[in-house]
């Protein structure tokens, strides 16, 4: 019987892997999103086991004990970051696919290793003599399975001990964390052959490319304690992972992952879009890799931004764009590759095909944004490197250069002119041509040199200043790794410490300029206060500290502003976007008006305000009362923010993530990740969904639990947010989030919800403002008043004002047409009158005059009629509106060789505080000094005479 042909295409390899393990009783589990839903501390899904982490920890249980999947993974940013290596090696990627199979307390080492061998040798047809394995030095069980049961020769099974400096610190011993599930692993390697440098694993040359790891089988059989000791787990598990791209390279008989069929297609597409003929160009590899990463990120809700996952996305997109720019593509192109990616991977990942248009739009918007600054940023970077080159050359006192004829290499010594030349050359942000002109003036004999790059070719040892790298980041949108990329290509290092220092300075300035919402400057070393504001608005308390002008005090007198700290308080301190409570603190005749409540530290609240009467002293017993009306309004707006957040994700997509919020008694302001304006129809749908939840009048509920339990509830968590061991899970309608704020008891307490504003606040960030309850009523009443006033002005019922406005607009258009016709007649008559004012200058008619009340169109129309009438002329017409001046210049075709309209209009405009430009026959300008216009017009004839 003929043996079936082994699968080789990426698509076939994927399918055959899943089919194989399905035949072994495994449940095929879809790839989980790149954004981990169960771990806010992990930036991206970086392995197949991430979605099963809770199963291994024992906090989750699945309806199956065997699983297999092909997992989309990303390693860019955070601990696992391959970004800087992509494009420079054969196997580094930002995005990759991990083939895996898992056992949750079911089968163990024997089945895992035997099935791996069966799949590799019988299904994929890999030569057995090309395979070898590693095991942990003490794992005799795995060693015996390989040598005695599978039949791998002992010399091809390598024991790896504790080679990382400690007990169980080994390439072949896997740990989920410092404590918890762990165990030995067995890695399978493929030998590419002796023609490729490198030694087997465990040897001094193991980092070579000859022996490549393709599959890792992890056997979680121990639980590690804090003291480093291990005890057997009651139900050992298996976790395996094999890189799809590496396996495909082997099966397709190529050495580099970038030569496999999937990448070959993407590289062809990148070459098409950039106009590149050389398919081996490393920049094409970068672009092909990055389109996978960025498209999958968008499909999982990550859009480019300036923080967290969004910033990693931005870095990857802009790195790809820069490589396209390097290949000569100066306009957006990257988004055009999405269709090619969908053709390659859309069948395996249907969400790519479903979201193709949105992915394309997001990437195109980011490209257009970056292309606005890319060219200027590259010019600045090139100029900065030129400065470094010139400085280095001058320090060496010798320049290596080429004569323009014959390319003969010569040396020029600066001798005694070094200091002079250095002073001339080292100036900020000049261009290479300017350096060379100065250099030619300073050093005799360099007249034939054209560019600084032809003068100096040795970039080694140069360092780009950190403050300049920060300027590229801050002003031109260059991520640091992009600047590093450019510099590395030229052998230049970047002063990253200087970059960080500049970044820290800017952050410090931003903090100083803003209202810092935690009074860390107050020196309070006492105990934490107890917050009772979830349960009530009044509290009997004792004053434990008083601050006046930032300094600790024992008493506060009438008329003084200060900060009061209580042992217990019902006042909510500003946090999580919700403003601090207002109210009063009183005792006897003393009354302290609380204007704001801020945190002194996480568990201590400071009550800011003014003592209106009496005296308050440390130790006094007081009554604390929150302003009930303000608190109720704030709670309505905070609670509706949660419901709105969920509605936004339902209407706009799961990519919507909170980027900031402000909740007070007047309104809620919510900033979120989204790349396009929210349409009127979408806003209506969001309003409908939110008000539907309000009308349901369901109870809200808050539960305090540990962070792991909260993760299991599916509560929304914000990546990068620092959560404590104990968190508060809030249920409002169908929304579930972690929140420490104050909220309504039932959704019906919110009242009416109405969106009052939608706008963009930053690249990829939109803002919605909304009102509730009495605020919503006031907003609608104000709109009614506006409609009533408009109806009165139009003398029409409110229901008919849109029709009446349409009629009025048609009347306006008709009047505008009449005015335009009259202006045309006026221009014709004025042209006849002005033609007689032209003077003859060397055979050319010259006219400079004003047209009172003319607009730009009238100036142009009159100009055309005058040119027809005068035949051979140079004309300047101007009009004045207050202090502003409009100027038009025109030159007939026969005179353009001597007089250009653009030069003429600038000559006049420069005298009236303005500038302008245009074509040789017609140009426009503006000015701000009407008083200088008569003299400017009087000078036109002489100016033309010098050129005629």
Curated annotation (Swiss-Prot):
Residues at which Zn(2+) binds: 638, 642, 739, 743
InterPro entries, per the entry: aa-tRNA-synth_II/BPL/LPL, Ala-tRNA-lgiase_IIc, Ala-tRNA-ligase_IIc_anticod-bd, Ala-tRNA-synth_IIc_core, Ala-tRNA-synth_IIc_N, Ala-tRNA_ligase, Ala_tRNA_ligase_euk/bac, DHHA1_dom
Sorted UniProt keywords: Aminoacyl-tRNA synthetase, ATP-binding, Cytoplasm, Ligase, Metal-binding, Nucleotide-binding, Protein biosynthesis, RNA-binding, tRNA-binding, Zinc
Cofactor requirements of the protein: Zn(2+)
Cofactor note: Binds 1 zinc ion per subunit.
Cystine pairings recorded for this chain: none
SUPFAM superfamilies reported for this sequence: Class II aaRS and biotin synthetases, Putative anticodon-binding domain of alanyl-tRNA synthetase (AlaRS), ThrRS/AlaRS common domain, Translation proteins
Cellular component per GO, a single term: cytosol
Primary location: cytoplasm
One GO term (biological process): negative regulation of DNA-templated transcription
Keyword Ligase in record: yes
This protein's domain notes: Consists of three domains; the N-terminal catalytic domain, the editing domain and the C-terminal C-Ala domain. The editing domain removes incorrectly charged amino acids, while the C-Ala domain, along with tRNA(Ala), serves as a bridge to cooperatively bring together the editing and aminoacylation centers thus stimulating deacylation of misacylated tRNAs.
Task performed by this protein: Catalyzes the attachment of alanine to tRNA(Ala) in a two-step reaction: alanine is first activated by ATP to form Ala-AMP and then transferred to the acceptor end of tRNA(Ala). Also edits incorrectly charged Ser-tRNA(Ala) and Gly-tRNA(Ala) via its editing domain.
Protein name: Alanine--tRNA ligase
Organism the protein comes from: Paracidovorax citrulli (strain AAC00-1) (Acidovorax citrulli)
Name of the coding gene: alaS
